[in-house]
Amino acid sequence: MGKIKTLYLIRNAKSDWNDIGASDFERGITKKGKKDMETMSSYLFLKNVIPDIILSSCSLRAQQTTDILVDKLNYSDKVEYLQELYYTPTQTLFELIAMQDAAYETVFVVGHNPQLTDIANLLIDEHISKIPSSGIVSINFDIQEWSEIVYKKGVVDFFIIPKQFKYYVPKQIRTLLEK
């Protein structure tokens, strides 16, 4: 038996399609995207989720999403912005996860669809139809090292999406959002 390692697949916050002059890579997030990611990040904070490392796509919207996570989690450790996370083949993403340091118990990957949904479905023995903007999937693995990760052996701890908080935001999260 190994110990539990947890992977958080975090889709970038809702991006702005109205800036016609911006390339896909340069699109930033919307006000709604910012608000949604602040809510999701506050949820992680209340669950005492702190990553050992954040791996983020280097697109503008992923960087802005990561900035919100860093701020709301009071995180000041390792953040790596990787070109490989910008619309990479799923197998490359799998290999990137498998290469993480064995000392890391909790790894965040901030990226894009369809790659995040595809990798989630490869890693778990269930089916997620889509990870929406600002959606977060937490997957546990009973392994000692990330290199031991295999398809279909991950177990979903939780899957949260902004719409869960559309009509009701718990008081603890509201308090954090007001800070």
Over which residues does each language-model region extend?
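Short, glycine/charged-enriched secondary-structure capping and boundary segments
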Residues: 22-25, 68-72, 94-97, 122-126, ...
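Active-site-proximal alpha-helix that buttresses catalytic centers in soluble enzyme cores
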Residues: 2-6, 10-88, 116, 130-131, ...
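Non-DNA-binding regulatory cores of transcription-related proteins
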Residues: 100-108, 113-135
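Short, surface-exposed amphipathic charged segments that create phosphate/polyanion-binding patches used
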Residues: 94-99, 173-175
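Domain-level recognition of soluble alpha/beta enzyme cores
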Residues: 127-159
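Conserved histidine-centered catalytic loops in small-molecule metabolism enzymes
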Residues: 52-72, 147-179
